[in-house]
């Protein structure tokens, strides 16, 4: 089964361009043109990755990302934010909102595919750990153990290290 990727952008030509590139790599693609629809799709579909435009009218990508990462049912889905904003403060804003990666437009195809594959690998490892251990993801953290009454949490960035131990 191929990975399911949600593309969220208010500009349909941008969606179509990404959709063509991703379906050529055999990914299953869903699309949304606004933040509200993106959240609805994320809540009702099994997704492996979200490509999310940062600047959209209404609910912007930063807010969509914040809401997704606050939802324990969605927090484990990696988000790559896409934007024409090049300033580092916008990248920081996206990362603070919970984005897992950031790609600046215009999008280089090689970088896009490499980052998509990297995030999907991390998602696969997270899914394997969750299925194997039965633990859950909460606010982008995986609780793997407890010391006394206190959970020991690891962010998704430490999972490859844990997995290789």
PLM regions and their residue ranges:
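Active-site beta3 strand of CheY-like receiver
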Residues: 45-51, 56
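Two-component/phosphorelay signaling modules centered on CheY-like receiver
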Residues: 11-30, 44
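Conserved small/polar residues in nucleotide/adenosyl-binding loops
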Residues: 155-161
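The feature encodes the CheY-like receiver
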Residues: 15, 57-58, 75, 87, ...
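C-terminal output helix
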Residues: 103-116, 120
């Amino acid at each position: 089964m191929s990975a399911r990727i949600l593309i969220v952008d208010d500009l349909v030509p941008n969606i179509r361009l990404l959709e063509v590139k991703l379906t050529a790599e055999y990914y299953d693609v869903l699309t949304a043109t606004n933040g509200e629809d993106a959240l609805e799709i994320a809540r009702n579909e099994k997704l492996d990755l979200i490509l999310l435009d940062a600047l959209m009218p209404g609910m912007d990508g930063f807010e969509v990302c914040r809401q997704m990462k606050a939802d324990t049912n969605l927090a484990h889905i990696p988000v790559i934010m896409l934007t024409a904003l090049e300033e580092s403060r916008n990248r920081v804003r996206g990362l603070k909102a919970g984005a897992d990666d950031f790609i600046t437009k215009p999008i280089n195809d090689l970088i896009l595919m490499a980052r998509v594959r990297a995030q999907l690998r991390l998602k696969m490892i997270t899914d394997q750990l969750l299925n194997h251990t039965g633990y859950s993801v909460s606010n982008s953290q995986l609780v793997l153990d407890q010391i006394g009454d206190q959970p020991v949490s690891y962010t998704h960035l430490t999972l490859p290290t844990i997995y290789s131990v």
